[in-house]
Amino acid sequence: MKRGFTLVEVLVAMAILVVVLAVGVRYFASTSELARNTQARSELQDRVRMVMQVVTADLQMAGARYWNSGNQNQAFSLPLPPLSGSNMGPKDTLTLYYVTSLRDLASACRRVDYGFEGDTLRRSDVNATPSSGSDCTTPPPNSQPLAEGMLALDIQYQCSDGSRKDTPDCGTDAYPRSAKVTVAGYSLTSVTNPGPASLTTVTGKTLACPQGRACYALTQEVLMPNLKPLPTP
């Protein structure tokens, strides 16, 4: 003879169902949180790497004077100094000039600037090519946001006389041969277990990570061969 479920059996089944649902909700919430944290950290690392790639490429080009395309060649004179900057703690500024063959002759001379507005790193890249002659001009910068959530663009310059400087000015008897660059930033959203509370830059500056944000830093050395003075005849 068939019989229905007793009240006790129904209550037990409901209790089991509630436990299973609670475990499922907790699992999916944990998975979603893990995905958000992973995405935030990945975006942070990609952003810092992008800034490092752009900055080191510009530094490597600083002082380049020649434009070449096929059989066409053009030498330009750059404003002096072709690389200048200020030591602003961990947020340095830069102004540099170079000639690139990746653009046509009418826009080969470039003026590039870096500076901060709060925690936003801004970059300017403007055409400094003269309408006639071979002397690159000094146009005003036109800064655009490059990356948000940046703690540092800290640069230490290795001079040809062996000294280390926090600005590109190595004096009259030396030139900046290379630069060690620290780029640091923080995640744009909060994460669980954010990691270290502070970071240290190449010049020894301590960076405090914002509460609840992951921080990430890269330090890289870049050679600047175009800044070596041309031999005098």
UniProtKB/Swiss-Prot annotation:
Question: Ranges of Polar residues compositional bias?
Answer: 126-137
Where in this protein does the record put region Disordered?
Answer: 121-143
Q: Which Pfam families match?
A: N_methyl (PF07963)
- What is the recorded membrane topology of this protein? Single-pass membrane protein
Modified-residue entries (N-methylphenylalanine), positions = F5
The membrane-spanning stretches of this chain are 5-25
The answer to whether keyword Cell membrane applies is: yes
Q: Does the keyword Hydrolase apply?
A: no
List the InterPro entries.
N_methyl_site (IPR012902), Pilin-like (IPR045584)
Principal subcellular localization: membrane
- Subcellular location, in the record's words? Cell inner membrane; Cell outer membrane; Periplasm
Q: Which positions are cleaved off as the propeptide during maturation?
A: 1-4
Q: Which domain of life is it from?
A: Bacteria
Of the GO CC terms on this record, one is: cell outer membrane
Effect of deleting the gene: Mutants have a wild-type piliation phenotype but are deficient in transformation.
- Which UniProt keywords are present, listed alphabetically? Cell inner membrane, Cell membrane, Cell outer membrane, Membrane, Methylation, Periplasm, Transmembrane, Transmembrane helix
What function is annotated for this protein?
Plays an essential role in natural DNA transformation but is not required for pilus biogenesis.
* Name used for this protein in its record: Pilin-like protein PilA3
Protein's organism: Thermus thermophilus (strain ATCC BAA-163 / DSM 7039 / HB27)
